[in-house]
């Protein structure tokens, strides 16, 4: 029997490779492996916990320079004294807020996830964009379509 979902996943993985978005491509390939093996029984758990685990891993990556000492406390303190750093802090707050809205939107309207992913991959492939991820994109979408 023809598996349309598998074909879509393969197409998205190909777009990931074409656009040099290895994160998207690798993620989709992992999901393909899960789908075609007995690991598919874990999909309910992945769907329920995957986003939270991903955010935890992302937060670990962002906080690692502080924890390792690569980013010394003096640099953190000085970030409150420079106007460019204050702008960066404000933008960080706004982007985090958008990401939160994006998580809510993706949870309440999962049908938008494919569109966000395709849009991100096309932006990288066609406009030399950077794959900043679907959470911020979903947050921006939530400002347009509303958070439901």
Swiss-Prot record:
Membrane topology value: Multi-pass membrane protein
Keywords tagged on the record: Cell membrane, Membrane, Transmembrane, Transmembrane helix
Any one Gene Ontology cellular component term annotated for this protein: plasma membrane
Pfam family, one: DUF441
Localization (cell): Cell membrane
Tree of life domain: Bacteria
TM annotation in the entry: 14-34, 51-71, 86-106, 121-141
Protein family: Belongs to the UPF0756 family.
Name recorded for this polypeptide: UPF0756 membrane protein YeaL
Organism this protein belongs to: Escherichia coli (strain 55989 / EAEC)
Gene name of the encoded protein: yeaL
